Amino acid sequence: MNLKEFESVLNQPANIRYEYFVKKVVDSETVWGLYEDGWAVTKDDNGNVLFPIWPKREFAEHCANNDWENYLGESMDLYEFIDDLLPRLKVDGLKPSIFFNNDDSAVLDVDILIRDLKAELEKY
């Protein structure tokens, strides 16, 4: 990915980045998070714990700063993500934070993300 594409996608509104995320992770069958002795998590202004995820390593590592400065991009298989990790997040009360750009992200219920990923998978 060239710098122009990277910056263009990164500067889109959260809802557009969410659509990009769904298409890219289904196409690559890979989801990216930040990892260092455990996955990176954060909290929103209401104290809800969020699990940040990205469509590509470059976007994840762009956010590896401040509390996450020693974290590295780590990939997850899309099917394990859908079948194992997302249900675990739901049980634990975490919400996915999709495509954080150091400013905002799309925060959705787990069930909505699963629905959207499965709908996109049906196109393949």
What are these regions (language model features)?
Residues 1-124:
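Conserved NAD+-utilizing ADP-ribose enzyme module
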